[in-house]
């Protein structure tokens, strides 16, 4: 039986929960097994977490919050560039933001493996769609800013825009699903940025330059 302090026991439960979630996935991971590995009773577990879902949240929320903060900073930078420079500069800045995004994911790889590979049965199974919806809001804002500059942007039907944006994030997250090394993932983002920037230019009617 665990005889450590509250903080030590808390960390032990987090450690064993993470290992079992990574191995079994959220749905198959057994709460009693987490308790057994951690040397606590189920009653002892509930002094730390409301339930298995609460434990999962504790493991992934810090990484998600950090990613969202980085994403917000990238948004601000991209919109500032768009307001003060031409359309061409935004593709370069967006590619750099993509590399930062992926670098953060690989610096918190176990958390994102939990989110992308092991979250079925939790609200985090919708993580990709959360990112898609946020990106689409940014695209609409980008279109508005370009319109103010006198640049005409073709409006895509919402379902088409969702489909293409989902494909974009799916490609990014493939690097986690298929166990890329960080260096290889970052290298692949250069190809991904070239591919999608050319595609976005085409479908939005922004030309080749």
Residue ranges and their predicted role:
Residues 2, 114, 146-195, 204-209:
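Hydrophobic/aromatic-rich alpha-helical bundle segments in the mid-to-C-terminal region
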Residues 12-19, 23, 33, 37, ...:
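Alpha-helical structural segments
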Residues 39-49:
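Short hydrophobic/aromatic patch on the recognition helix
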Residues 75, 79-84, 93, 99-122:
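Amphipathic alpha-helical segments used for helix-helix packing
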Residues 88-110, 162, 166, 170, ...:
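Amphipathic alpha-helical segments that line or abut small-molecule/effector binding pockets
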Residues 100-107, 122-148, 159-166:
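Amphipathic alpha-helical packing segments from all-alpha helical-bundle domains
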